[in-house]
């Protein structure tokens, strides 16, 4: 619950900037950065340290050198504002991501949508919860999420709003072997995992660059629901705390689709 409150507090801070003029700068890799990213980051870092100062924190906006983190066995992995471009475009499709990693695996994940006032949170040890909230003081609805039991008809693939690459077309053709028709749910940021967790979508292929903090929380949530997030070529689960924090291309599937496509 305390981590949920941290995410809600960060989201409230993000919305203060969302409803004002958005001042954008750019990082060394040309990706956008706003004051909302930094304000959310400070809230999350400070509060996670207060929660347990013994657990180190790796955040998109507070990077740690490889030498310092290479022996970490347990740590927080944070994206204080996932979907900065969506935030700048004011389409509501941005999120706060917080994950707890243990021995290179995400064991707890939280994805919160400040705009929707909705979060999915949990892991294999706790189960997954869907929480609707008005404020820190008022979580209005808690709901335990069960494993999806069947795929959609037709199959639904959640994806980014960008152009479909060749590998994505190939993946769609594989899905058509299961269902003749494939529908698309285009969405920004880690909110794609909302669609997977709720059963509104069946698969999420990603053949474009992402970073570890973009995916860890979603992987923890999806795996707790019997699904998977695997390397697109090897089929192995994604690894974390690599020297290079860029993810390989990956494919995420809900549990019933795994059974049909294995």
Question: PLM features: residue spans?
Answer:
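Residue-level signal for inorganic ion chemistry
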Residues: 10, 14, 37, 48, ...
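Acidic beta-strand-loop-alpha-helix segment within the catalytic core
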Residues: 98-193, 238, 242-262
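N-terminal subdomain of lithium-sensitive/metallo-dependent phosphomonoesterases centered on the IMPase/IPPase/PAP
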Residues: 1-81, 136, 170-173, 234-236
């Amino acid at each position: 619950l305390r981590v949920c409150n941290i995410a809600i507090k960060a989201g409230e801070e993000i919305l203060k900037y969302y409803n004002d003029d958005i001042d954008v700068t750019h990082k060394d890799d040309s990706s956008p950065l706003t004051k909302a990213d930094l304000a959310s980051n400070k809230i999350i870092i400070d509060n996670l340290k207060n929660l347990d100062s013994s657990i180190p924190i790796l955040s998109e906006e507070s990077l740690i050198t490889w030498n310092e983190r290479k022996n970490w066995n347990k740590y927080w992995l944070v994206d204080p504002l996932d979907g900065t471009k969506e935030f700048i475009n004011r389409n509501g499709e941005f999120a706060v991501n917080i994950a707890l990693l243990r021995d290179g695996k995400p064991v707890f994940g939280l994805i919160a949508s400040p705009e929707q006032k909705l979060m999915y949170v949990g892991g294999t040890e706790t189960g997954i919860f869907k929480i609707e909230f008005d404020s820190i003081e008022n979580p209005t609805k808690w709901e335990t999420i069960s494993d999806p039991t069947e795929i959609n008809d037709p199959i639904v693939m959640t994806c980014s709003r960008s152009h479909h690459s060749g590998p994505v077309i190939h993946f769609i053709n594989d899905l058509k072997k299961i269902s003749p028709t494939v529908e698309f749910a285009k969405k920004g940021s880690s909110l794609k995992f909302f669609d997977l967790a709720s059963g509104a979508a069946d698969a999420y292929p990603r053949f474009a660059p992402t970073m570890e903090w973009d995916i860890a929380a979603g992987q923890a949530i999806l795996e707790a629901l019997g699904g998977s997030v695997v390397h697109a070529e090897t089929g192995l689960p994604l690894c974390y705390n690599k020297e290079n924090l860029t993810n390989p291309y990956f494919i995420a599937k809900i549990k019933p689709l795994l059974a049909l496509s294995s």
